[in-house]
Every structure is written in C-alpha cells, then in structure tokens.
Amino acid sequence: MSAPSAEEAAVLATLDNQGPALLQQVEGWSAINSGSRNLDGLARMADTLAEAFRPLGGQLSYRDPASASSVGADGRESPLLHGRNLHLVQRPEAPIRVLLTGHMDTVFAVDHPFQGVTRLDDNTINGPGVADMKGGIAVMLAALKAVEASPFAAGFGYEVILNSDEEVSSPGSAPLLAEAARRVQAGLTYEPAMPDGALAGARKGSGNFSAVIRGKAAHAGRNPQDGRNAIVAAGDLALGLATFPKRRPGLSANPARIDGGGPNNIVPDLAILRFNVRPSTTEDQRWAETAMAEIIAAVSAEHGVEIELKGGFGRPPKPLDANQRRLFDLVRACGADLGLDIGWRDTGGVCDGNNLAACGLPVVDTLGVRGGAIHSAEEFMLVDSLVERARLSALLLMRLAQGALPAAAAAAAGASA
C-alpha cells in the first residue's frame, strides 16, 4: 500500500476534529451500568446504541439471545438470562462484506463501587468499560459513519453485532456470531488495543466447567466409613487438573471454586468444582478433553462418587495462521500509511474473535481504543486513541471496499460458509 489517496484522505479528514464529541459519547455510555447480569442496564444500553447506530441506515434489529443455563450450588441447572443483542445489516448483497462486532456488557455489576468516570489527565480517563469496550464501539461507529458518507460505501456491505454477554463467554450470542461470520469475508472486533498500540495476535481458547460430584452422607463420628466425601473428591479432582500445565506445556487449568459441604458432623455428599481450562491449540483442547475424562473416571473410582461434568469450550483457540496474518498485514499496512507502527503480541485472553476465527473467518479483534487495566477499577482509556483508531478503521474499511483483502483469505472465509 501507499499513502492514502486523495479520496481516502478526504474521508479521514472528516474524523480529525471529532475527538471531543467521541469522548463525550464514551463518557455518556460509561455512565450506564451494563454489567452482564444487569438486564435493565443492558436494555437501556441497547436502546442508546440503537439510536446511535440508526443513522447509518440498513436494517437494525434486536435479536433475542439463545437459551443458556448455569449450575447452581445445589448442582442443578437453571436458565441463565442474557440481554438482547443489536444487529445491523447494510447492503447484504454487496460482493465484499465485513462483520464488525462489539459488546455492550461490562464486568462491573450494578452494585460494584466502580461506576463513575474520572479524567485523570488531558489524555486519560478512568471508568467502567471506557476501554472494554464502549470506547471501541465509539471508534467503530465513527469509522462507519465516515465511510458510509463517502463514495466507498457502495463498494461493500457490512453487518454489526453488539452483543450483551461477551464478558461471560457469549453463550446467548454465539449462534448469531457464527451465522454472520459465514456470510462475510473479514471480521473486525473492537476490543481494546494495548497502551502502546499493539494488537492481540494468537489467543488461547477457554473452557468453563462445573464438575458436579455426588457422594454419600454419613455421620462424621458414628459411621464416617459409610460416607463418600464429595468435598475430598473435589479436592482430589482439583489437584489432578492442576497438573495440566506440567503435563502439557502451553495448556493452563485453574480450579477456581468449590461449592458444597455443610455441618461439621456430616460427611458431605455434594460438591461442585468450578474450573477453567485454556488451550493454546486445538490439539491442546483435544488433549484436555481426554485428560479430564480420565481424571474424572479415576477420582470417581477412588472415592466412590458420581461426577457429572457440565460446560465446555466456549472459546476455541485462535492461532495466528496464514489466513489471519493476511488481514493483520493489511491492518499493519493501513497503520503505516497513517504513521502508526502496529505490531501484535500473543495473549491468553479470549474474546468473540476466537469464535469468529473458528468459523474460518480472518479477524483482527483489537481495533478499539488504546487502554489498559481492564476488568479492574483502574481501567483507563487514552483519549487521543479515539480519533487515531477511528482513522485506522476507516482506512481499513475503504481498503477492504476496494478489494484489498488477499484472495486467499477471502476464499478461506467463503469456504467455511
């Protein structure tokens, strides 16, 4: 690629003075608590975003989440409710089609003390979701508005999905994401870039599990030998899972919580072990699935308990393969044309980009603002990155509209449909 053409430069110039308006937009959105379990807040956030995206035109709709469930402390599954998702479709018959995704939910519950936005200095704000990822949604919208008002708009179609459950692994929106991924040639997701501007490259996968362990109650003093201690079995299972990193380098397992037990004089007959497994590759994932089954069988036999495993790998591993690199190279070239040196680093974190890549779609999933300390009360966004990253996305969209995505990447995406 070369420096932006005169036509591209004219579009980019429309973004140059939008910094104050974009900052005000992010601050307003951050003031709406949209924690993943705050359905009222998510509904308000969805309505607010619908009004913001409606001027783009196209078909805008609310999409109900798929059914999901969770395992309670009693070992029983119950329905788990999620908010509705926003879906915008623009020019679906265009020969070049792009999927842009973001999430309206945050990790901060309605009763979390971290609720306000604070300006730390002229270029830094602190607030819930400012980086992850309400700032990213603002970047996405600004870029789309700029390109939509340009001659380049006729060259491509796009879909936008803003889901309500990304922070809890997208159980209600995963089918919607997969359907859309199979209709397009490239995916752009607006998770925050790193403070230095680097993007996430390869990502580990992630699986969340609940092992429901049922033993046998007995009196702890009179006849403990007749009991089958579910808590002890859960501990044994946790220790077995903790060996995964040594047995399979690159794979991590985190036994996170044990629910169960009761009075001190009763052998506990129920325990729920909750754990997370993160594989680097699909081979790691298959190894983990086999190893989990083996450990569960061994613990069950050793302790005389029944173990039922719930959950699964909701985020497949996302390797930085040749298909992904072609889109990364295009982003890097666009950045260079704007004076940005864009690199990437592998990460153990996961996002909807994992799911899109699993559909065969080339995807760059950290096109949002530069920021950091996400998932904490120190979360921050660098203000100058709003315009910087909006310009990057706008140029990327214009290049995609002109057919810049290498044929091999587009063909791979189409083959997965």
Across the structure, where does each feature detected by a protein language model lie?
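Metal-dependent amide/peptide-bond hydrolase catalytic core
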Residues: 1-10, 14, 34, 51-52, ...
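Acidic/His- and Gly-rich active-site-bordering loop/insert found
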Residues: 2-126, 149
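Short coil/turn connectors at secondary-structure junctions
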Residues: 83, 94-98, 114, 121-122, ...
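Short beta-strand segments
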Residues: 100-102, 161-163, 188-191, 212-214, ...
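Acidic-glycine-rich active-site phosphate/pyrophosphate-binding loop
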Residues: 105-121, 184, 202-212, 333, ...
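Glycine/charged-rich beta-loop-alpha catalytic/anionic-binding loops adjacent to active sites
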Residues: 115-130, 214-218, 374
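Acidic/histidine-rich catalytic neighborhood of metal-dependent amide-processing enzymes
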Residues: 133-204, 246, 401, 405-411, ...
